[in-house]
Amino acid sequence: MASVSMRDMLTAGVHFGHQTRYWNPKMKQFIFGARNRVHIINLEKTVPMFNEALAELAKVGEKKGKVLFVGTKRAASESVKEAALASNQYYVNNRWLGGMLTNWKTVRQSIKRLKELEVQSTDGTFDKLTKKEALMRTREMEKLEKSLGGIKDMGGLPDALFVIDADHEHIAIKEANNLGIPVFAVVDTNSSPDGVDYIIPGNDDAIRAVQLYLNAAAQAINEGRNKDVAAVAEKDGFVEAE
């Protein structure tokens, strides 16, 4: 089962928080102390909390649930996309558009438009347009792909959010809270854990730390889905005798 050790976290720098002057008092219980005016996160709390979160993500995977990975800042953007693709899930890694969850009806219309433009770009429709019109549609398609490309095949609201940087993605967390969607989030010492169902106290800036969270999350989801496949095969008598 997917799990992360204390050594893994130390190597990735998960324990380094923000400068002490930027701290959020709501994170006090997860802080071990300070070194050179930088808060040190208590990994004795992070390790079991993260592993509990991974176990829950595996359950979402087992139920064929949809997980939306959210991380729009530069340190997380590419890794968020990679983790989502590696686990056949969905992502928002550019900019969170207000109402992405709470106004899904409108978002669905934009996704429909994106898919129409994608078809037009390959079926010869663009070739029949003037250069200016074709350019305008291409730009519209690229803009929509940038903001909605990671959710265009989601087909409805997600069953869980996995967020890198609770402070930066507070709008996404609030929308998920309003809809009762469980939130898994990395919460650094400058952030509030409010609204996060599965808190992962840790560094949300170091690329190695971000990759550690995301790789483990993707692995947990995949393991959950594979467990379900194995269970179905066994039930149907497809498991070969050893």
Curated annotation (Swiss-Prot):
It comes from the Bacteria. Keywords: Ribonucleoprotein, Ribosomal protein. This is Small ribosomal subunit protein uS2. GO terms for biological process: translation. The lineage of its organism: Bacteria, Pseudomonadati, Pseudomonadota, Gammaproteobacteria, Vibrionales. The gene is rpsB. HAMAP family: Ribosomal_uS2_B (MF_00291_B). SUPFAM superfamilies: Ribosomal protein S2. It comes from Vibrio cholerae serotype O1 (strain ATCC 39315 / El Tor Inaba N16961). One of its GO terms (molecular function) is structural constituent of ribosome. Belongs to the universal ribosomal protein uS2 family. GO terms for cellular component: cytosolic small ribosomal subunit. PROSITE patterns: RIBOSOMAL_S2_1, RIBOSOMAL_S2_2. InterPro entries: Ribosomal_uS2, Ribosomal_uS2_bac/mit/plastid, Ribosomal_uS2_CS, Ribosomal_uS2_flav_dom_sf.
